[in-house]
Design a protein with these regions (language model features):
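Broad structural signal for hydrophobic residues in well-ordered alpha-helices, predominantly aliphatic
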Residues: 15, 65, 89-90, 184, ...
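C-terminal accessory extensions appended to soluble enzyme cores
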Residues: 226-250
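A short, structured active-site edge motif that brings together acidic residues
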Residues: 26-30, 102-106, 197, 201
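C-terminal/domain-terminus segments
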Residues: 31-35, 173, 246-250
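PAPS-dependent sulfotransferase catalytic domain
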Residues: 76-195, 208-218
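PAPS-dependent sulfotransferase catalytic core
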Residues: 1-62, 68, 203-207
Length: 250
């Protein structure tokens, strides 16, 4: 779980070197569960309210979705810690909820977006407006993926929810990858796998890669070597954005 541009694909590239563990791409499983749950608001369900049978379907979503995957452990990427999602998972996952939370300061996330869409004409934020300010405000809208993940992270940080979570700062993942990854294995209570932290592979899981033609080329392209660098595009963030979102830090 993380805001976009926070190291999701990087973490997955490293973790997926282990043939027994799968760290997924953006997952639709929570959306499936949400859509099934909201069938309770339809006239058909309200006319015949079989909660138990619908609950059986909800409880089978993860098991059925991943039943043909060869890995023993699946790290499903999604906003698991929003209030609604957490309630659904605790009731229907069938095992304790464990969530790896990647964190990157908000302005660094937005600077990463700027670097991408200023250099990639096909990037989807370029449809949001002509100026950087317009594009960033649109990216931060309440219904977008950044805000949804941010709400999920804020909920994860509540004292009563922290026991479900392992927090990773983006900077630690890049500068100290081995102890950071080791910590995630301890959290998952599984044996450590000797990972490679150079010559990294682009994301490909079970023979499937991202199709970035949908959202803009190179959205999920990672650097093959780990190196923490200052992003010069951070200087291009408008003051209006800094004033509204600059306080969002861990």
């Amino acid at each position: 779980m993380a805001m976009p541009r926070s190291g999701n694909t990087l973490l997955a590239s490293i973790i997926n070197q282990n043939p027994k563990v799968a760290c997924t791409a953006n997952s639709i499983t929570l959306e499936i569960m949400k859509d099934i749950f909201f069938l309770k608001k339809t006239d058909v369900f309200l006319n015949y309210q079989d909660h138990k049978s619908l609950g059986n379907v909800l409880s089978s979503v993860f098991q059925n979705y991943y039943k043909d995957w060869p890995q023993d452990i699946i790290i499903d990427r999604g906003p698991a810690m929003t209030d609604g999602n957490l309630i659904l998972l605790q009731k229907h996952l069938g095992q304790p909820v464990k969530c790896i939370v990647l964190w990157r300061d908000q302005l660094d996330v937005l600077a990463s977006y700027i670097k991408w869409f200023e250099n990639e004409p096909t990037a989807y934020p370029n449809h949001y407006g002509k100026t950087i300010e317009e594009k960033l405000f649109k990216l931060m809208n309440d219904k977008g993926s950044i805000s949804k993940e941010l709400r999920s992270i804020q909920n994860a940080m509540k004292p009563e929810n922290q026991k479900h979570c392992f927090f990773i700062r983006y900077e630690d993942l890049v500068k100290e990858p081995e102890p950071t990854i080791q910590g995630s294995y301890e959290f998952l209570e599984t044996d450590y796998y000797p990972h490679r932290f150079d010559s990294l592979d682009q994301f490909n899981l079970n023979g499937i890669a991202y199709n970035d033609n949908v959202v803009g080329r190179n959205l999920h392209t990672i650097k093959t070597e780990l190196k923490l660098e200052e992003n010069p595009y951070k200087k291009m963030i408008p003051q209006s954005i800094i004033k509204k979102y600059g306080h969002i830090r861990l």
